[in-house]
Amino acid sequence: MVKDTLFSTPIAKLGDFIFDENVAEVFPDMIQRSVPGYSNIITAIGMLAERFVTADSNVYDLGCSRGAATLSARRNIHQPNVKIIGIDNSQPMVERCCQHIAAYHSEIPVEILCNDIRHVEIKNASMVILNFTLQFLPPEDRVALLIKIYEGLNPNGVLVLSEKFRFEDTKVNHLLIDLHHQFKRANGYSELEVSQKRTALENVMRTDSIETHKVRLKNIGFSQVELWFQCFNFGSMIAVK
C-alpha cells in the first residue's frame, strides 16, 4: 500500500481536490487513515449484500473508486445470476479498480465503467452502494440521482449511503470536526496535511445533515431509512424500497 504524502509539503497554489492519478495511487492508505470506521463499513457492505442481493439482479457501486465495496459485496453474494456494475468518473481509479477486481477470482461478473453516475441507467437492482460519493455531487443534482436509484431498485432492494455529515448544532459540529482531525493526527497526518487537505476539499465536498438525508430519502419513497453506523462525523445509512 502506497503511503499518502500528497499534502505533506506546503503547496503554493492549492487547487480543488480531484481524484487524479496521484490520489488514485495512494487512495487505500488515504481513506483508511482519513475516514473513521471505513473498514467496518466495507465489511458490513458485504454482510448487507449477503442479506439483500437476490437472484437474477444487479448490484451497483456508484463511485466505486478502487473497488473495496465491490469486492466486499461480491465475496458475500451467494445468489445465482447476479452482476455487479461499478462506476467512477476518474479514469485512474477505474484502471486500478479493474486491476484490483481481476486479482480475485469469482464466478460473479463485474463490469467497471468510467462514467458520470448521473448519466448511468439503474435497472433491476437489488442493491445500490453510494459509499462517500453523494457528498461530491452538486447539491442540486442529489435528489434526481436518488430518485433514479429508487426507481431502479426492485421491491425490498437496498441503498447503502455512506457520507460525512454536518450537524445543525454548531458546538457538536465543531467537536466532531475536531475529533476527526485528532483521528487523522493519530494516524500520522501532520497539521499541515490536515489543513491543506481540508482547504482542497472545501469547494468540492458539501455535506448534509443526517436529518436532511433521512427526510430526502423518505420523501422519495423509501419505506425504511436508518443510520446503522456512525463514528464522529462519518457514517452510513440504509434505505429499503
From Swiss-Prot:
Catalytic activities: prephenate + S-adenosyl-L-methionine = carboxy-S-adenosyl-L-methionine + 3-phenylpyruvate + H2O
Enzyme Commission no: 2.1.3.-
Keyword Chloroplast: no
Pfam families associated with the record: Methyltransf_25
GO MF: carboxyl- or carbamoyltransferase activity; S-adenosyl-L-methionine binding
EC class of the enzyme, as a word: transferase
SUPFAM superfamilies listed in its UniProt record: S-adenosyl-L-methionine-dependent methyltransferases
GO biological process, one term: tRNA wobble uridine modification
Stretches of the chain forming a coiled coil according to its record: none
Transmembrane regions: none
Keywords (A to Z) from UniProt: S-adenosyl-L-methionine, Transferase
Role played: Catalyzes the conversion of S-adenosyl-L-methionine (SAM) to carboxy-S-adenosyl-L-methionine (Cx-SAM).
Protein name: Carboxy-S-adenosyl-L-methionine synthase
Organism: Haemophilus influenzae (strain PittEE)
Name of the gene this protein is made from: cmoA
